[in-house]
Amino acid sequence: MALDGERGEQEEEKKKKKKKKKRKKKEEEGAEKSSSPFAATMGEDDAALRASGRGLSDPWADSVGVRPRTTERHIAVHKRLVLAFAVSIVALLAVTMLAVLLSLRFDECGASAAMPGTDGGLGGFPERGGNSSYPGSARRNHHAGEESSQREIGEVGTAGTPSAHPPSEEEQEQWQPWTQLRLSGHLKPLHYNLMLTAFMENFTFSGEVNVEIACQNATRYVVLHASRVAVEKVQVAEDRAFGAVPVAGFFLYPQTQVLVVVLNRTLDAQRHYNLKIIYNALIENELLGFFRSSYVIHGERRFLGVTQFSPTHARKAFPCFDEPIYKATFKISIKHQATYLSLSNMPVETSVFEEDGWVTDHFSQTPLMSTYYLAWAICNFTYRETTTKSGVVVRLYARPDAIRRGSGDYALHITKRLIEFYEDYFKVPYSLPKLDLLAVPKHPYAAMENWGLSIFVEQRILLDPSVSSISYLLDVTMVIVHEICHQWFGDLVTPVWWEDVWLKEGFAHYFEFVGTDYLYPSWNMEKQRFLTDVLHEVMLLDGLASSHPVSQEVLRATDIDKVFDWIAYKKGAALIRMLANFMGHSVFQRGLQDYLTIHKYGNAARNDLWNTLSEALKRNGKYVNIQEVMDQWTLQMGYPVITILGNMTAENRILITQQHFIYDIGAKTKALQLQNSSYLWQIPLTIVVGNRSHVSSEAIIWVSNKSEHHRITYLDKGSWILGNINQTGYFRVNYDLRNWRLLIDQLIRNHEVLSVSNRAGLIDDAFSLARAGYLPQNIPLEIIRYLSEEKDFLPWHAASRALYPLDKLLDRMENYNIFNEYILKQVATTYSKLGWPKNNFNGSVVQASYQHEELRREVIMLACSFGNKHCHQQASTLISDWISSNRNRIPLNVRDIVYCTGVSLLDEDVWEFIWMKFHSTTAVSEKKILLEALTCSDDRNLLSRLLNLSLNSEVVLDQDAIDVIIHVARNPHGRDLAWKFFRDKWKILNTRYGEALFMNSKLISGVTEFLNTEGELKELKNFMKSYDGVASASFSRAVETVEANVRWKRLYQDELFQWLGKAMRH
C-alpha cells in the first residue's frame, strides 16, 4: 500500500482550497509552524541539500522550519505579532527539549512493546509481496504457516513507539532520498557485522546488523534497503565515541523497499558512524531472499535454509545498502541448532557450542564485495573435497545419499581444473581461501555465483554416471564453467549498475564455451556449438521489434529484473565473441587480464572495458576505437542484415548494404522507435570467394554505411561469395538469388569445401531470412537437401533447430503431412547409416565419441519426431522390454527420445508406468526426463491431469512446473489445454514466479510462442489487457511473436506447400 495513499478528485480539490488559505494566512503572519506530527521532527533544512542546489520547494520548506516573511504593508511590525512570535519560539524550544529527552529515553529502552493482542509474541509477519515492521521475538509463539495480525505497510516507527504518522502527501517531494530508485550516495557502508539466529523448527530468524558507515555529505536521514523484515530497534552512534546520535524515528517505505531513519541532528560529512539494527523475519517458503527448501531421506522430510540475493533480494534478509556499487567487508555469525551446519562466503573461523544444543559459527571477514553475492546456508548436508594447485579448498555439499553415490564427484573434479584454468587465463589468482558448491533441491535458477559459496539446483550439478547422458553431462559442465567464471567476472569485478549486467553475464556465458573447450578440446564448443546454442537462439529474440539494447537504462526498481534476460546473457556473449575475433584472441586475452587487474575488488562500467581493450590493441600496433564500434552494438537494439549483391556491369565489384533485421515488417512500422530509424552499425564483415574446388583467403571489410561498393578479387561468373565466415559476427547475410543458387549447388556437389560452421550458418540464415520475407520459402528447404551427405553434428543441429518452429507453425494444418514427408525424406538416409547406439556408458570415451553420438541422437530425434516407422517401432520395443523385465536397457543418450515416443504411441498403462518411475527414482537427471516424457501423451485427459498436478509442490518442484506447462504447450494435442490452463491459473503462477528472474518470461514465451491463429491472437491480446502492466514486456514480445506467426501463415504458407507439392512429385 502506498505510503501517501491514493489521490482522488475530492482530495485534489481539498488541497487546492487548503493552499489558498495558507497563502492568505502567510500574508497576515510572519511565520507558521507545520501541523504535521512527522514534520515536527525535521528541524532545520538539510545543509547538504541546499548546498547542492536541490533546496526544498516552498510548500515543503514552510512545513519544516521557521521562515519569517514581510508583507507589502508598513515596515513596522505590530507589537502583538512580535509577542506572538516570541511565544511561539519559546514553545518550540520547550517541545524540542522534551522530544530530545524522550528520544534518549527511547534509545535506552528500545521498541520492546508488543502489538496489542500478541502477548509479547510476533506482531504479525509481512504478507507476501508486502513490507511491514513488527515487534517481538522470532523465537517465541510462532508456528510455521500461522497468519498473524499485520501492521499497515509503510508505518513510521520511532525508537520508543511502535508507530507514528507517515509523511503527508504534500511532503512527498522529489528530493526526498527515500523516494528515489537509487540511494543518494550521502552514506557509504564500509563494514557489516551481521549476527543471525535461525529457528528452523518454525522457519523464522532474528538478526542484528551493525554497519560502519562513512558520511560523504551531511544528512539527517539514514536510508538503506529493507523489505519484508520487522525492524525492532535502530541506534546510531558516532565512531569516535562521541555517544549516540538521537533517532527521531524510522519507517519502512515499501515503494522503494527502503528503511528510513530520521535523526534529530545532522550527520557530519567526512565522519564515520555506526548503525545498529535489530530485526526479525521469516525463512520464506518462496525462492528469493532467505528461503527454505526440503528433501526426503529414509522417509523423513528434512529442511534447509538457503539464500538467493541477486539482484535485489539481500534486503529481504537484512537491512543493507543493496546496490552493486556499495562494496563493503562482511563479518557473519550464524547461530543454529547443533544438528545443522552453516555455510557462508568465507570459512568458519571459530564455532562456539552451547549447552542447550545450539552452536554459533563465526566466519572470517570477506574482502570488499557487493551485497547481491553474499550468501549463507543452514543444512544437514555432507561433503567431499579437493584442493587446487594454489591451495584453494573446494568442497561439494549435497544430500547425504547423493554424496554416498558419488553424484557430486564429477562437479568437484572439473571445478578444481577450472579454477586452475581461469587463474592461468586471467593471470589473477582466485581471491578466497575456499570455494563451496552447494546442491539444493529447490532454487529459482540453475545456479548462483555467490563468492566462495556457489549454489546450484541439483539438476545442474549432480551427475550419476549410470543414468546420465552425454547431453546431461554437457549441461552440468557448462553451468559449472559459467559459475566459476563469475568468481572473476561479477564477484571480483562487479558492474557499477544493473544496466551493464551483461558485463558479467555475457562474459560468463561466453566462457561456458571457452572453459568447456579447455576440459574437452575436441568438442570445439566455441567455434561450433556456440552458433546453435547462443547465436542462432538469441538472434530469434533480438529480431523482434520489441527487443531492447544489451545495455538498457534502469529507471525504475521494476526495471532491474527486466535486464536479466537472454539479450544480456546470449547477445552479450555473442558480442564478446565478435570482439575477440576481430581483435585477435591473444590481444583480447591480454586486455581482459588488464581489466581484471585494474578493477579487482571494485566496480567497472562498459567504458572501462572498452578503454582497456583499446589500450591492448594500441600496444599491438592497431588503432581501433573500441568504444565507438561497440557502443553501436550495445546501445542500439537488434542487429543488421548485410546484403551482398554481385554487380554484373562492373567486373569484381559488389554492392554491400545494411539494414535493421526485423522478423515482422508490420511490427516495425507500428513501433514508434523504429519508424524512419537510421540504425547503423560498424560491421566487421569477413568475406571469401570460392568455386567448386577452391576458396580464397579470408578478407575483412568494415561496413559502416547503408550501402557501399567494394572491389573483390577472384570474382567471376561461376564464383560464389560467402560473408561472415564461421559466423563470428552478430549479423545475418543475404545474397542475390544467383549467389544462393551457387551456394546450394556447392553444398550438393561438395559441401566440405565450406567449413562446418559456415554450413550451419548458411542453414540458419536461410530459414530466418525466409521467415522474415527476405527470401523465397523454398531456398532453406532446398539447402537442407544436401544433409543426406552431411556427417557432422553442427549442420544437423542447426537444421533441427530451424525446422522446429516451422514444424510448430504447420503441425495443425490439414496438409501438414506433405511437410512431414519432405523432412523424413531428408533424414532417412542418415538415420539408416547411423542406426541406434548400444546401451553402454564409459566416461573415458565421452570426449572421443561426443560429436558422433550427438549426431546420432539428433537424427534419431528428427526421425522419431516426424514419424519414421522404424524409429517408432524401436522406441516402443525398448519401452515394452523395460516394463516387462523391469530392467532399463534403453541407451542413455536417447532415453528422453524413447520415453517421449513411447508415451505418445502406447496406452495409458505406459503413462502410469513412467509416472511411477518418476516418483521412485532418486537420480535427478532421470527424474527430469521422466517428467518431461509425461507431457508427450496424445491423451488430453492425461495432459490435463498432469497440468493440474504440476502446481502441487509436493509432487513437482516449483522450478519444474514451468517446464511441464511449456512442454504440454509444445505438444499439438495439448497446446490449447496449456494455453487455457495458463490463463486460468495466471494469478497463482504470477504470485509464485513473478519476482524470479526469467521464470515469468520463460513461462509466457513457452506457452504462447506457437499460437498462430487469429482467434488465439485475439485471446492473447484480451488476456494481456485484463492484466495491464503485469509482465508487460514479456506479453508484448508474446503478442509480436504471435502476430508474426499469423502474418507468416497468411503470406507464405501457400507458397511453401505449393513448392513442397512439386518437390515431392519429382
From Swiss-Prot:
User: Which positions bear Phosphothreonine?
Assistant: T71
Residues in the Extracellular compartment per record? 103-1066
For the Cytoplasmic compartment, the record's topological domain ranges are 1-81
Fetch the Pfam families from UniProt.
ERAP1_C (PF11838), Peptidase_M1 (PF01433), Peptidase_M1_N (PF17900)
- Biased composition (Gly residues) is annotated at 118-127
Protein localization: Membrane
Query: Where does the record say carbohydrate is attached?
Result: N131, N202, N217, N264, N380, N647, N676, N691, N705, N726, N842, N948
Instruction: Provide the tissue specificity.
Output: Predominantly expressed in brain and pituitary. Lower levels in lung and liver.
**Does the record's keyword annotation contain Hydrolase?**
yes
**Single GO biological process annotation from the record:** proteolysis
Positions binding Zn(2+) in this chain are H482, H486, E505
Active site (catalytic residues): E483
Binding, substrate: A446, A447, M448, E449, N450
**Basic residues bias: where?**
15-25
So what EC number does this one have?
A: 3.4.19.6
- GO molecular function (one): peptide binding
Catalytic activity, reaction form: Release of the N-terminal pyroglutamyl group from pGlu-|-His-Xaa tripeptides and pGlu-|-His-Xaa-Gly tetrapeptides
Region Disordered, annotated ranges: 1-43, 117-177
Classification via PROSITE patterns: ZINC_PROTEASE (PS00142)
Q: Which residues cross the membrane?
A: 82-102
Q: How would you classify this enzyme at the top EC level?
A: hydrolase
Name the protein family: Belongs to the peptidase M1 family.
Function, please?
Answer: Specific inactivation of TRH after its release.
Name of the protein in its database record: Thyrotropin-releasing hormone-degrading ectoenzyme
